[in-house]
């Protein structure tokens, strides 16, 4: 049953919304996360209104004091929101009116909820981007420090999840450092498109009042205002960029967690995770499960979904504002909270894990990952590489049938294969030698890994 419409926008209506319809349209359950930013935006707006003589300095001071009181109450957890006021903007105006009286109604002069909500979201995301960039810097530092400790730790390098060539564990970690550095660069670029003020665009066409958009932008800490009022209220690209960047970040974290999950299994035993980041089983007493790594891997799905959700919302929206845009917030909030916690979890998990360097190195001696070394050895002595590749492949087949490895083959047998092979072949086949010799730029050679780490430390 409908009643008389008492909404702040209700002048044009004869009846109010049914309660269940009102609840469907309300967003206060989630957009209250914007409360602090809504108040800060309003403080900047009313300061400008007073400075420009659009409202009296006395009224501006009264409104500003009321807003500052509400901000303190919000930070103290004392504000209560009402679903009948729909969203954070109407709730704040209602609370302000209750605090200072009808003069609160002057706050909305030369402003619409359209530019107001866009401003709130720019402020929120700008703050979150700073937090994400800082946490990424911490994770990258953890990786560099861990890599520095394990420059000389040898592990199997993989292709197709099969042993390929021995590499430095530090080199492996630095590959992830590079991924997370690119993530950081993307978020830093994201700041550029977030650092714009929509305030003053009003509903879509600007306003007849002599406002100063540069002033409010400066008061809120933005680089500049949007140059087009339609774009200002309808643009959500900055959120889509954030969700896209977050999806790539989660993909990188998921890939790393997948490896950590494998490394701490009985089959690998490369690392041991701290109890802080592990859980047990309700039935199997022996279990120590890498749940936090699995959760990061799993949560990548929800972050991807948030990106696709907003892309779908935006794909057919005409200019300028549409109620569909209410659906831009929950995914943004969820993604921001997910990646900030995941970054802390991954950094903590990596910094506290124990690396079984001896077992890592031993695993490179129980495979044929030194096969390329033998082929390169022959090629370096003048044999065409393709011929060397063929010879080594046949020798591996022979070794596989006889149950031994290349380093176990007697010199006499080697010399029946090629008189180019001498005693020094055994040094070549050692994993440490194989890694050390790969000194091409960006390679896994120890000096190259040290150089990568030194460059990373400069960047950090």
From Swiss-Prot:
Q: List where in the cell it is found.
A: Cytoplasm
| Enzyme Commission code | 4.3.2.1
A cellular-component GO term for this protein: cytosol
- Which GO molecular function annotations are given, in alphabetical order? argininosuccinate lyase activity
Q: Does the keyword Amino-acid biosynthesis apply?
A: yes
> Pathway, according to UniProt?
Amino-acid biosynthesis; L-arginine biosynthesis; L-arginine from L-ornithine and carbamoyl phosphate: step 3/3
The answer on whether this UniProt entry bears the keyword Cytoplasm reads yes
Q: Which UniProt keywords apply?
A: Amino-acid biosynthesis, Arginine biosynthesis, Cytoplasm, Lyase
Question: Which CDD domains does the UniProt record give?
Answer: Argininosuccinate_lyase (cd01359)
One GO biological process this protein is involved in is: arginine biosynthetic process via ornithine
Tell me the InterPro entries matching this sequence: Arg_succ_lyase_C, Argininosuccinate_lyase, Fumarase/histidase_N, Fumarate_lyase_CS, Fumarate_lyase_fam, Fumarate_lyase_N, L-Aspartase-like
Top-tier EC class: lyase
Under catalytic activity, the entry for this protein gives: 2-(N(omega)-L-arginino)succinate = fumarate + L-arginine
Q: What is its main location?
A: cytoplasm
Which PROSITE patterns does this one have?
FUMARATE_LYASES (PS00163)
Similarity-based family: Belongs to the lyase 1 family. Argininosuccinate lyase subfamily.
- Under which name does UniProt file this protein? Argininosuccinate lyase
From what organism does this protein derive? Streptococcus mutans serotype c (strain ATCC 700610 / UA159)
């Amino acid at each position: 049953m409908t009643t008389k419409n008492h909404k702040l926008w209700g002048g044009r209506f004869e009846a109010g919304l049914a309660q269940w319809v009102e609840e469907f349209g309300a967003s206060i359950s989630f957009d209250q996360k914007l409360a602090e930013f809504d108040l800060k935006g309003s403080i900047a707006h009313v300061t400008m209104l007073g400075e420009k003589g659009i409202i009296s300095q006395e009224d501006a001071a009264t409104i500003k004091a009321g807003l500052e009181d509400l901000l303190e109450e919000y930070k103290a957890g004392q504000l209560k929101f009402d679903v009948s006021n729909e969203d954070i903007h109407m709730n704040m105006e209602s609370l302000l009116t209750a605090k200072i009286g009808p003069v609160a109604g002057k706050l909305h002069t030369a402003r619409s909820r359209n530019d107001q909500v866009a401003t709130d979201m720019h402020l929120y995301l700008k703050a979150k981007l700073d937090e994400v960039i800082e946490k990424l810097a911490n994770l990258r530092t953890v990786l560099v420090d861990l890599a520095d400790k394990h420059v000389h730790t040898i592990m199997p390098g993989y292709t197709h999840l099969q042993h390929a060539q021995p590499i430095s564990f530090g080199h492996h970690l630095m590959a992830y450092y590079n991924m997370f550095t690119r993530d950081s660069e993307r978020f830093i670029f994201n700041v550029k498109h977030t650092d714009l003020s929509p305030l003053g665009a009003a509903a879509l066409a600007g306003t007849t009042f002599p406002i100063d958009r540069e002033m409010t932008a400066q008061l809120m800490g933005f680089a500049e205002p949007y140059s087009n009022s339609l774009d200002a209220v309808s643009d959500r690209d900055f959120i889509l960029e954030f969700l896209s960047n977050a999806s790539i970040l989660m993909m990188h974290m998921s890939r790393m967690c997948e490896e950590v999950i494998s490394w701490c299994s009985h089959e690998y035993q490369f690392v041991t995770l701290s109890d802080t980041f592990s859980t047990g089983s309700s039935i199997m007493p022996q279990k120590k499960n890498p749940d936090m790594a699995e959760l990061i891997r799993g949560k990548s799905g929800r972050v991807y979904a948030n990106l696709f959700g907003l892309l779908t919302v935006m794909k057919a929206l005409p200019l300028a504002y549409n109620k569909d845009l209410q659906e831009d917030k929950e995914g943004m909030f969820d993604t921001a909270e997910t990646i900030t916690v995941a970054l802390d979890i991954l950094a903590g998990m990596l910094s506290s894990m124990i690396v079984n360097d001896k077992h890592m190195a031993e695993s490179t001696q129980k495979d044929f990952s030194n096969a390329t070394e033998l082929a390169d050895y022959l090629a370096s002595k003048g044999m065409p590489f393709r011929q060397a590749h063929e010879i080594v492949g046949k020798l591996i087949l022979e070794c596989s049938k006889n149950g031994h490895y290349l380093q176990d083959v007697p010199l006499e047998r080697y010399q029946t294969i090629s008189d180019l092979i001498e005693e020094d072949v055994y040094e070549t086949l050692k994993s440490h030698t194989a890694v050390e010799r790969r000194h091409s730029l960006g390679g896994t050679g120890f000096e190259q890994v040290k150089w990568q780490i030194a460059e990373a430390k400069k960047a950090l």
